[in-house]
């Protein structure tokens, strides 16, 4: 590592919590203990919770890329003739979060039975709608579709 001040940012996913048993008293998440680099302890580090649901996705800047890697934000648009209750089919995607028109719509995980996110009519607008996806596993899938039914494995 070159001399000087450096910044390392890590994202630790928290997919659940303990809801019973003695471990419920210590349900901590994140990094704990000493942090080392080549057996040298790193000091003056801090852990900050990231409120993903409150992320201002409308302010993100996107650049065209062939492979976003992971984790990665994706952005797209879709058109709605008449706003109605619908579902966003997320089957084939790994794990992530979805925003429609800048508002948090829900999360998905390939291991869950439910493979769709409900989009109430109130979240959609006639004409163009924006879709932002924060994908953690990036398996190469780049499309989602709307469905009039919930999708389950």
Predicted segments, located by residue:
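Solvent-exposed loop and beta-edge segments used for protein-protein assembly and interaction
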Residues: 2-4, 27, 68-72, 80-82, ...
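Surface-exposed beta-loop interaction hotspot
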Residues: 29-57, 79-80
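Edge strands and adjacent loops of beta-rich recognition modules
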Residues: 49-74
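Terminal leader/tail segments of proteins
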Residues: 87, 117-153
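A cross-kingdom feature marking solvent-exposed beta-strand/loop segments within repeated
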Residues: 1-5, 85, 104-125
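Aromatic-lined ligand-binding clefts that engage carbohydrates, nucleic acids, or primary amines
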Residues: 8, 78-101, 108-109, 131-134
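Short, well-structured beta-strand segments enriched in hydrophobic/aromatic residues
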Residues: 2-16, 127-135
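Glycine/proline-rich low-complexity spacer/linker segments in large multi-domain proteins
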Residues: 13-43, 138-153
């Amino acid at each position: 590592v070159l001399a000087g001040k450096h910044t390392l940012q890590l994202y630790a996913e928290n997919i659940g919590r303990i809801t019973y048993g003695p471990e419920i008293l210590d349900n901590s998440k994140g990094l704990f203990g000493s942090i080392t680099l080549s057996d040298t302890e790193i000091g003056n580090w801090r852990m900050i919770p990231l409120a993903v649901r409150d992320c201002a996705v409308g302010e993100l800047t996107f650049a065209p890329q062939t492979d976003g890697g992971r984790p990665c934000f994706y952005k797209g648009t879709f058109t709605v003739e008449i706003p109605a209750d619908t579902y966003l089919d997320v089957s084939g995607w790994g794990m992530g979060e979805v925003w429609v028109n800048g508002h948090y719509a829900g999360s998905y995980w390939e291991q869950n039975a439910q493979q769709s996110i409900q989009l109430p009519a109130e979240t959609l607008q006639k004409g163009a709608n924006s879709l932002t996806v924060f994908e953690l596993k990036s398996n190469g899938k780049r499309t989602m579709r709307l469905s009039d039914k919930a999708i389950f494995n």
